[in-house]
Each structure stands twice: as structure tokens, then as C-alpha cells.
């Protein structure tokens, strides 16, 4: 199962968090969900964000405002000189949504350890007609050099302009997709070439997450329920014995 599903969706609530954090009633939920999708596509389409390497857009809704957090490897490009770009982005989003919007920028210090940015980099090189094997080797080596414990990159499409599409994959280190406490990042990007679209998938393993970052209450709850059931069965046996003695 871990090989098929999204590693991020499988680990939500364990060591991953939701990109959108808000509560809504059944009538409002669909409208707010589509609004979140519109905000993300809107931000990525702005000219100020084209070459900013934005990996993720978090949306947090408060009663009075909407907070948008952009995770980027190039915060200077997003902010601009004296904050001109970020003010322009905030004003445009606020105008289209007709709501009070607060824009925040969070820097990604190591872009080689972000699966989405690695996939985007590979897709960019494939669009520039660089050899796909060279792209995969360079991306894999750069990721492992930055401190990752494992990486898997898969490309699929008309590789090298071949008439038949195929899938190629490169692995280095280990990527334990079935282990829920493993910190695995996943990213997907598309390269649009003259021969067609090429899909790029990246799985990146950064190590195990222990302590408060993992949920440990499941085992304790199971042990507690077994203990309680054992105590109840002992009480039933005692009651039967007392009834038998009285009879």
C-alpha cells in the first residue's frame, strides 16, 4: 500500500500537517476548498513568482482574515526591493477574493532536500533538452550530498524523443514507504517538450521522526483496553463463583 498512495497523505496527522487549516460547515466547505485551489493557482501564475521556486502554499483561515504562507527557496524574489512584490501579490489576491489577506514568506534553506523543488529542477532541465539520464544522476547526487538518506526519482514519457513512451527510475539509499514514522517527502512536476509531456516523481527520505513528532498513544490505548477487558473478565468469573456458592 505504501508504494501506491501519496506518502504525504498517508502520514497526515502522524508527521505531516495539512496545507489548508480551517473549519467550515457542510454548506461552506466546497466553496472554501475551491477558493484555496484558486489562491494556489493564482499565486503560482503571478510574474513575481515565476522563478521564485515556490514549493508549497499554506492557507490558514481566521474569522477576520486569510493567512497565506509561501514556502520558497528564493524569498528575495518574492519579497522584492523594499517589499514591493509581496505587497503587490497581497493586494491582487485581496482584490480577487474580496477578503482581508495576509501574505507571509518562509525560506527553504536547502532546496535539494525538498522533493517538489527537485522534481521542478529535473523538469526544467528536460524542457531544455538535457539528457534525462544526466538529469537523474545529477539530481540524485546533489540530494544525497545535501544530507538525504535516500532518494528515488522516476520519469515517464517520450524520453529522448523516442516514439514509444517508457518509464525510467533511479534510486540511491533507502526509501521505506511502508514505515509511517519515516520522514518522506514527495513531489511531482511535468516537463512540456516538443515530443509531449514528461512526468517527474520524486520520493525523498530524510530519516526517522521520533519523540513528540510521532503518535505513541495508539499502543497505550490498545494495552489499556486489553487490561480493562481482562479486569472485566476476572470480575465476571468472581460473580459466577459467588452465585454458585450462594446457590
From Swiss-Prot:
Assigned keywords, A-Z: Ribonucleoprotein, Ribosomal protein, RNA-binding, rRNA-binding
The keyword rRNA-binding appears for this protein: yes
GO cellular component terms listed in the entry, alphabetical order: cytosolic small ribosomal subunit
Residue ranges occupied by any KH type-2 domain in the UniProt entry: 39-109
SUPFAM superfamilies: Prokaryotic type KH domain (KH-domain type II), Ribosomal protein S3 C-terminal domain
Presence of the UniProt keyword Ribosomal protein in the record: yes
GO terms for biological process, alphabetical: translation
UniProt-listed Pfam families: KH_2, Ribosomal_S3_C
Top-rank taxon, per record: Bacteria
HAMAP family: Ribosomal_uS3_B
Its job: Binds the lower part of the 30S subunit head. Binds mRNA in the 70S ribosome, positioning it for translation.
Family: Belongs to the universal ribosomal protein uS3 family.
Protein name: Small ribosomal subunit protein uS3
Lineage of the species this protein comes from: Bacteria, Pseudomonadati, Spirochaetota, Spirochaetia, Spirochaetales
Designated gene of the protein: rpsC
